Amino acid sequence: MPVGRSLSLDPNLLAQLQSHSPTLWLNPHQGMPLPDFAPTAADLADADARLRRCAGLLAELFAELRPSGGLIASPLQPAEPLKRAARAGHAQAGAWYVKRDDALPVAGSIKARGGFHEVLALAESIAERHGLAGADTDRRALASGAARARFARHTVMVGSTGNLGLSIGMLASALGFRTVVHMSADAKAWKKARLRTRGVEVVEHAGDYAKAVDAGRRQAAGMPCCHFVDDEGSRMLFLGYATAAAELAAQLAQAGRPVDARHPLFVHLPCGVGGAPGGIVYGLKALYGEHVHAFVAEPTASPCVLVQLAGDAAHPRSVYDIGLDNRTEADGLAVAQASPLAAALLRAQAAGAFTVDDRQLFAHLLDARERLGIDLEPSAAAAFGGPAWIAGSDAGRAYLRGRGIDPDAATHVIWATGGSLVPAQEHRRFQAHARAQRQVGGAGA
């Protein structure tokens, strides 16, 4: 049987994916009922409340968070220069913004939202169970000597390609937990080094992301007092990401950008295993319903969410199943199989997915530097082509026409997911590579 035949993928889509051709796929399942296990409005409110009541604790632990009072928040930057630079025939309509999660303090990436939320939920649970905190206790008590001594009896473990490990590792170690991060072969050396300087135990694996996660899961299962942060299925991570929706809504309101039937919101999100974009989309759908149109961006070598959404929902599928190799410079997106939790929710809520090759990643990275003054890591630039796909491709224009959307009235938010902690020499290397490829022919459409 040919590779991919059993996945129930459209033959034309399968051929595009197997050829590594950048592709826009529109989700025919958008609007279907949510699964029974979908988070509730109370779950979303609880997550937001947790991050707010722990803000003082975070500000005490990390000087970088004191200017925000400990709140995990990033700027919304207008991207008019990027819009003006879009080539003829591509997206020129609507208002463009970049959501700067690359600038989130401490962890330097979108993973701070989910990772911090899960660690804080664990710390609260342990502290309350042992009489160290109650419902009304100032959460700065979780940094006390007594709390740290209690946390030191517990291990926090996670598998990661890099950024989630940084997020979990930075906060868990700061609270006194023994912290172990299993990192895949894709993880960058500087991320491992940064964790080790914080006293985090880094376990390196020769395999991919899924193998690192599985190794961590199996080790944690045999250890007492060990909490495994499961990036493939954690509701706490998912809910932490979802809290970004209210933050974005407030920023759009301040910018005078309404979101309603006449003024749709398009959100373009880099996607690895799916938890971060899935959570953000879930939060935005809770606020705006059908007026938000979310597209996830994946490497051509690793479109795990696209493969899962476009195929049979009943069976987990991997990019290896269609003959792809999961090898990309976008280390944070080098994931072969989607989170079952995120995929089930994105199936009902995502408008679609598009793929980007490594040449495009570096072209977008250079555009971010030259047009907006933003230094990103390659995976964080994956979604920069989103507005062009919507207004500059046949499939994108068909999507707009089918919904009666006026492109000029739309707001596009491109999520930048990481880069502020990347060492300067790495940024120079990224940009030199991007300039070299531009000199020999550019990145294509």
From Swiss-Prot:
Pfam families: PALP. It catalyses: D-serine = pyruvate + NH4(+). Its cofactor is pyridoxal 5'-phosphate. The modification N6-(pyridoxal phosphate)lysine is found at K111. The keyword Lyase applies. Its EC number is 4.3.1.18. One of its GO terms (biological process) is D-serine catabolic process. One of its GO terms (molecular function) is hydro-lyase activity. PANTHER family: D-SERINE DEHYDRATASE, THREONINE DEHYDRATASE, MITOCHONDRIAL-RELATED. Belongs to the serine/threonine dehydratase family. DsdA subfamily. This is Probable D-serine dehydratase. The gene is dsdA.
